[in-house]
């Protein structure tokens, strides 16, 4: 498991973005702790499978109760991020960009990251800091870009990481079953409610996660097609941009996705907004603001836009 990250990053450099390892190990017998940690780590790799030789013991996630729960947690995150991951693969196919990335590739001016291979990025927006040592309940990691105003948000609490100095190697709590994941400020992540299969997930409502940077801005993109055809007859591209407390969504393409927009979550909102509108119409009753975490959540939006989340351009404003 320790060598899985540098191996994956090497294949990214080789121009082979669809890479994964034999999760829980291939040769010899695994154990509960190793499989627990590895099932969570591999959930953030481009290719994800559990596989071993016939002579080894069974290592399906359901063999151990703790691995079941750890796998469900990580796979739920992976499945909710499938639209983001699919878009990363589209960009890799069309532009040669990478899916799994070393910290140094995104922050090339920081020489301290040149040999960092215990953390990695999934695309530009998701940072993963896994436990790679037996018996550990914490892990050391850095938060790159802090010297230049970068913000990182904890995936689970949705709060901004604070109290960390630029370049500081921080000890992060990571009990068995928990893998630290962070969202980069300045990102907009289109997501879908996770289903039991990728096909089921593709038919679920949409959500948008906005992580504001220090200037209150963010951006992201989405690529959608039928998910099956080798040469799609119709495609859809969506641009999502945040400026001046407004999320602007613009679409282009001929593919029609009828799944509704269910929720929008904005991280890093400094104060409770006095007014929230969707395409100029008040939606304040759908909004909740958490002053301690700085999170603005809008839920239950399913019936507000007829036809689907991406059938037309739209604008969400708070302030």
PLM feature segments, named:
Residues 181-281, 290, 300-319:
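Accessory, solvent-exposed terminal regions and/or long lumenal/extracellular loops of proteins
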Residues 153-176, 277-301:
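Solvent-exposed beta-strand/loop surfaces of large extracellular or lumenal domains
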Residues 117-118, 139, 238, 274, ...:
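Residue-level detector of beta-strand structural context in well-folded domains
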